[in-house]
Curated annotation (Swiss-Prot):
Neurotoxin. Causes spastic paralysis and death in mice. Moderate inhibitor of L-type calcium channels (Cav1/CACNA1). GO terms for molecular function: calcium channel regulator activity; ion channel inhibitor activity; toxin activity. It comes from Phoneutria nigriventer. Expressed by the venom gland. The keyword Secreted applies. It comes from the Eukaryota. InterPro entries: Huwentoxin-1 (IPR011696). This is U17-ctenitoxin-Pn1a. It is found in: Secreted.
Length: 36
């Protein structure tokens, strides 16, 4: 399974590529992106 690269929309950390986390620009708000 291909991982989601940086800045990709995501639902959980496990979707993101290694070293990236699924988080929003504003805490606990949508949308959430894979980011460092």
């Amino acid at each position: 399974i291909a991982c989601a690269p940086r800045f990709s929309l995501c639902n959980s950390d496990k979707e993101c590529c290694k070293g990236l986390r699924c988080q929003s620009r504003i805490a606990n708000m949508w949308p959430t992106f894979c980011s460092q």
